[in-house]
Amino acid sequence: MSLGVLAAAIAVGLGALGAGIANGLIVSRTIEGIARQPELRPVLQTTMFIGVALVEALPIIGVVFSFIYLGR
């Protein structure tokens, strides 16, 4: 096993860990906001879904870059 494979695995793993933590924080804050102001639920949910989509894009990009790096 080369160091490149190990580096790719660490990059993908840390990207997934960071995304998991960020998604938890995003959803937690959204629930707090909805509990405080229920009338803003549609706006908060839309913002939450956009935020979660952006956060989830980063680990996917990390996996793609890892495959590109390993393919060389």
Swiss-Prot record:
PROSITE patterns: ATPASE_C
UniProt keyword annotation of Transferase present: no
Alphabetized GO MF terms: lipid binding; proton-transporting ATP synthase activity, rotational mechanism
Origin: domain of life: Bacteria
Keywords from the UniProt entry: ATP synthesis, Cell membrane, CF(0), Hydrogen ion transport, Ion transport, Lipid-binding, Membrane, Transmembrane, Transmembrane helix, Transport
Membrane topology listed for this record: Multi-pass membrane protein
Location within or outside the cell: Cell membrane
Membrane-spanning intervals of the chain: 1-21, 48-68
One of the record's GO cellular component terms: proton-transporting two-sector ATPase complex, proton-transporting domain
Residues the UniProt record annotates as site (Reversibly protonated during proton transport): 56
Keyword Transport attached: yes
InterPro entries: ATP_synth_csu_bac/chlpt, ATP_synth_F0_csu, ATP_synth_F0_csu_DDCD_BS, ATP_synth_F0_csu_sf, ATPase_proteolipid_c-like_dom, F/V-ATP_Csub_sf
CDD domains: ATP-synt_Fo_c_ATPE (cd18185)
Pfam families noted in UniProt: ATP-synt_C
Chain's role: F(1)F(0) ATP synthase produces ATP from ADP in the presence of a proton or sodium gradient. F-type ATPases consist of two structural domains, F(1) containing the extramembraneous catalytic core and F(0) containing the membrane proton channel, linked together by a central stalk and a peripheral stalk. During catalysis, ATP synthesis in the catalytic domain of F(1) is coupled via a rotary mechanism of the central stalk subunits to proton translocation.
UniProt subunit comment: F-type ATPases have 2 components, F(1) - the catalytic core - and F(0) - the membrane proton channel. F(1) has five subunits: alpha(3), beta(3), gamma(1), delta(1), epsilon(1). F(0) has three main subunits: a(1), b(2) and c(10-14). The alpha and beta chains form an alternating ring which encloses part of the gamma chain. F(1) is attached to F(0) by a central stalk formed by the gamma and epsilon chains, while a peripheral stalk is formed by the delta and b chains.
Entry's family note: Belongs to the ATPase C chain family.
Protein name (record): ATP synthase subunit c
Lineage of the organism: Bacteria, Bacillati, Bacillota, Bacilli, Bacillales
